[in-house]
């Protein structure tokens, strides 16, 4: 499951060089159709339940696509791999990854978005509840190193001086909150396995609801593949949208398909996670604009916000370097309009 928000600028540059070494490796081919490999930055899990449903139910085959997920991990820079041309599409955990990549000159562009509202949140316990950003004043907030900029953004958005909050750098588990080392801790609301340790009464303060609007699980490709194979991307989006619609209508059956594909996953945990995931995958926007859509204005706000936070060492990227609506427009009538 994706947990890291986005790579550092150093890892983007280092990963780009490493990926070029393998750029000449042959792509997978099959009589089933045109290969589409989706590179992740993490180990495959519940975030890909829609793609797994589409694969196992034959939706990709209907589009003459031979689909495969390429898992990531701690030492795999998925953005750099896709940018090198080795694989056709990719998915990152959070939209800032693609803004930073565009700023560094990597030729990748977002063509659709999975989670319309990022499930990143600040978690607290009833003994010291944090329900609003103002409740953070005078408190210890545990945040991963890559998430420091988001805490800064949240505080600025809500008019809170940074020196009024004590920032504590933590790892990826929730233990510091349970032990009382911190009063709040960051994570994904969809990561129900990690949240178990907090018990049933924990509180979640979503980043999105408090002014910092990021996208999660955006899909991206290279500028070259976008130009040469828009029909393949459109087919990929149609099939994936059908898969997610199936998950929404049949969550338990979809979890069964997921666990059949990845037997290491725990069915009960994935059932708990899928209900949270569907809440951010399908919103009022998808009801009117279709699954996978995004608002260009939200993207521009993100670019402006990260520029104000001085995150673009190589310069602020232009909107058309970060995203394209071309494939969404091609599939406007085909993507499920569900909310």
Where are these regions (language model features)?
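Conserved C-terminal helix/tail region of periplasmic/extracytoplasmic solute-binding proteins
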Residues: 299-339
């Amino acid at each position: 499951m994706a947990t890291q928000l986005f790579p550092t600028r150093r890892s983007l540059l280092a990963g780009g060089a490493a990926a070029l070494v393998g750029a000449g490796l042959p792509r997978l081919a099959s009589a089933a159709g045109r290969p589409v490999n989706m590179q992740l930055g993490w180990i495959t899990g519940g975030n890909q339940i829609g793609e797994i449903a589409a694969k196992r139910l034959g939706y990709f085959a209907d589009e003459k696509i031979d689909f495969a997920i390429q898992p990531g991990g701690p030492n795999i820079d998925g953005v750099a791999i896709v940018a090198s041309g080795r694989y056709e599409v990719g998915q990152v955990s959070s939209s800032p990854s693609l803004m930073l990549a565009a700023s560094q000159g990597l030729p990748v562009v977002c063509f659709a978005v999975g989670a319309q509202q990022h499930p990143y949140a600040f978690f607290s316990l009833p003994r010291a509840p944090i329900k609003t950003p103002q409740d953070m004043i005078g408190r210890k907030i545990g945040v991963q190193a890559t998430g420091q900029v988001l805490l800064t953004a949240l505080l600025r958005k809500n008019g809170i001086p940074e020196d009024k909050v004590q920032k504590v750098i933590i790892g990826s588990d929730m233990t510091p909150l349970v032990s009382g080392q911190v009063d709040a801790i960051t994570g994904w609301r969809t990561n129900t396995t990690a949240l178990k340790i907090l018990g049933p009464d924990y509180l979640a303060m979503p980043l999105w609801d408090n002014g910092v609007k990021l996208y999660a699980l955006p899909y991206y490709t290279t500028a070259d593949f976008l130009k040469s194979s828009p029909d393949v991307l459109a087919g990929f989006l149609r099939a994936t949208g059908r898969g997610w619609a199936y998950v929404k209508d049949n969550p338990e059956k979809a979890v069964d398909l997921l666990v059949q594909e990845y037997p290491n996953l725990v069915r009960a945990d994935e059932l708990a996670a899928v209900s949270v995931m569907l809440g951010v995958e399908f919103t009022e926007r998808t009801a009117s604009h279709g699954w996978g859509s995004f608002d260009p204005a939200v993207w521009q706000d993100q670019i402006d916000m990260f520029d104000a936070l001085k995150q673009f060492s190589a310069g602020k990227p232009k909107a058309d370097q970060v995203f394209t609506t071309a494939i969404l427009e091609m599939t406007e009538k085909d993507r499920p309009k569900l909310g």
